[in-house]
Swiss-Prot record:
This is Uncharacterized protein ORF326b. The lineage of its organism: Viruses, Viruses incertae sedis, Bicaudaviridae, Bicaudavirus. Belongs to the ParB family. InterPro entries: ParB/Sulfiredoxin_dom, ParB/Sulfiredoxin_sf.
Length: 326
């Protein structure tokens, strides 16, 4: 199980796995939960898997729909197998609801549907729940950090969901600037991000579905652009001239350090290769956001293009990328 990020998501996009939901006893505190949501808002994020299926929060999702709530906070977890996903769902609900022994026994009985004998099911599930409990406890500080940010610093909570920041690090940042928070929250988003970047908080992004989706969209955009300027080197270009020419040669965006070094060697770039080896591997997420936003003012200050027979080496504000002919 791997942490995948915090987001806000449309209630209508949340999926229910009917088979998995059968393993979870009905919540007998629906009315109390509904009253709390009406009074305090949707404080506890729904936990979903990488495919958008609810792992924990069935009752809250149903209540949100009843109350006409359009979007709710979610935590994404990436599971390696259906078995891990099922164990986590059961354990999360055991912890959250403080189930009675009778309810836990019902879970054991439902686990028999996997084909194990009653004795084997009880023994196996009990062992796995104990192991899972250790991992689930690591989630509690993150959830607490999310709750504090959501109630005390909604402006930071918005950035948390939007940029998939580490909630515990962001909470530490909030506590350190709490005295000046009224000033901070009035700053434009660009200035807030500049401050977070200087504190290295924006570097805490973990791999998660939304980020992968961004890169898939960006790669699709990049592959639709089939050429760059034909000069051997073009300094301080702009976005329009960068994508000006069309020669019909489809190109593949190269992201991995290994692929980059191999292609540089094939292209015989010499000093550029040495420089590239010293560059940290970058995902250029900000550049992607600029492309997706369509902002004509968000043009990189410096674009250098080195055209070679097998492709083009591109330096955007000092960071090196490569587009190679397929």
């Amino acid at each position: 199980m791997k942490f995948g990020g915090y987001f806000t998501k449309s209630v209508d996009d949340l999926k229910i796995d009917e088979e998995l939901s059968k393993l979870i006893p009905e919540n007998t505190m629906s009315d109390k939960i509904k009253n709390e949501i009406q009074k305090y808002g949707f404080l506890y994020p729904v936990i979903i898997d990488q495919n958008g299926f609810v792992i924990d929060g069935y009752t809250r999702v149903r209540i949100a729909k009843e109350l006409g709530i359009k979007e709710v906070p979610v935590i994404v977890y990436i599971f390696d197998s259906p078995e891990e996903r099922m164990r986590s769902a059961i354990q999360l609900n055991v912890i959250r609801r403080h189930l009675t022994h009778e309810q836990i026994e019902q879970l054991y009985q439902k686990y028999l549907s996997t084909g194990l004998s009653p004795k084997e099911a009880v023994k196996k599930l009990d062992k796995e729940l104990k192991q899972e409990n250790i991992r689930i406890k690591n989630l509690e500080p993150k959830m607490r950090a999310v709750e504090i940010l959501q109630s005390e610093a909604p402006e930071l909570f918005e950035l948390l969901a939007k940029y998939q920041l580490d909630p515990q690090l962001l909470l530490q940042f909030y506590l350190s600037i709490k005295e000046f928070y009224d000033y901070f929250k009035q700053l434009p988003e660009e200035k807030k991000l500049e401050i977070l970047r200087s504190e290295r908080l924006l570097l805490q992004v973990e791999a998660e579905p939304a980020l992968l989706k961004q890169f898939a969209e960006a790669e699709k955009f990049a592959s639709s652009v089939t050429s760059v300027p034909t000069t051997e080197q073009e300094d301080n270009g702009d976005l329009e001239s960068f994508y000006r020419g069309v020669d019909g040669n489809e190109e593949e965006l190269i992201r991995s350090k290994e692929e980059l070094n191999e292609a540089l060697e094939q292209m015989g770039l010499g000093t550029e290769e040495e420089e590239a080896e010293n560059q940290d591997e970058q995902l250029f997420s900000e550049f992607i956001e600029e492309l997706k936003s369509g902002s004509v003012t968000a043009v990189p200050k410096s674009i250098e293009v080195y055209k070679k027979e097998n492709g083009r080496l591109i330096k955007i504000e000092g960071e090196i990328y490569l587009k190679r002919k397929s």
